[in-house]
Amino acid sequence: KFAIEKGCNVFDDEIVDVAVNTQGIDYITSKTKTYNYDFYIDCTGFSRLLIGKLGATWNSYSDHLLMKEAIVFPTPQEEETPLWTLAKAMDAGWMFRIPVQGRKGNGYIFDSNFITAEQAQIEVEKYLGYSIDVAKHIKFDPGAVDRPWIKNVCAIGLSASFVEPLEASSIGTSINQAFLLARRMINYNEQSINRYNIEVNAIMENVRDFIALHYVSNRRDTPFWNKVASTPLPHTLQENLKMWKTRLPIADDFTSYTKKVLFNEYNVALVMHGLDLFDTDSILTQYNMLPDEVLMQIDEICKHKINFDRSKTIPHKLMLELLRHLV
């Protein structure tokens, strides 16, 4: 709707063939029509119909991220809308519960080497205490294309990358890709394309490492979690964890190739703290070395957060309803 309002033409059609030349994609054909344009954005999802024609290859993250399948299902909305989304560890993966308008969106992301989709459904129903209707069964290979931009084609979204939605990274990476592309499309050349690909690869390595960080766990109670314990971490994450064990992550640790990474020092510090990965004595020494003025400011911020008066706020569900009426 928004695109049409901005003057975009929408064609409800199905691609049957893609023709290439030395400049990239020459034209696209459907059963009834030929489409010929100067530049193409590949939004064909896992099919990668355009970027695949130009030789992009898939770099799988499956050596580090074990999830391969998911079942997705809705559940009724609760009386009050929670302020958070739930990610719960399960026997062979994890389950998400996301409150949306009128219902809850749910899914069990699992490693199919250990359970089937049917077994995943049984485990979910046992946890919830009632039956569910599986809306979709999804299979995927976590990873990213080596070159999301080749000649006159740029892959964005699922055609460029996908990892399990543990941190809802797909929308964020797509938005950042679009911003980067918008800045580099004017009079672009091979150097512009190469720089774009370097930045997007850095974004995806940041996502991969942050997801892998969540699995640095002492859990060993099922065959899947035993496998997780022996699964190698990405080399970049291994090196960073050695550094972060005795000092907090800082902004400079995340800006080597691009400023568009999704996850920064604050995200990493929260997860590492929850997983008890810090040497707290070393961190305390670092904290005590801060100037007195900074320590006083931190103390005031903490007091303000602790003494926050919840009675002066309105329920989250009511707030969302008011916002919807404003749009």
Feature annotation, model-predicted:
Residues 2-128:
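Predominantly flavin-linked oxidoreductase catalytic cores and closely associated redox partners
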Residues 55-56, 129, 157, 307:
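Glycine-centered secondary-structure boundary/capping sites
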Residues 183, 187-327:
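Long, low-complexity C-terminal extensions of enzymes
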Residues 101, 110-220:
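FAD/FMN-dependent oxidoreductases across multiple families
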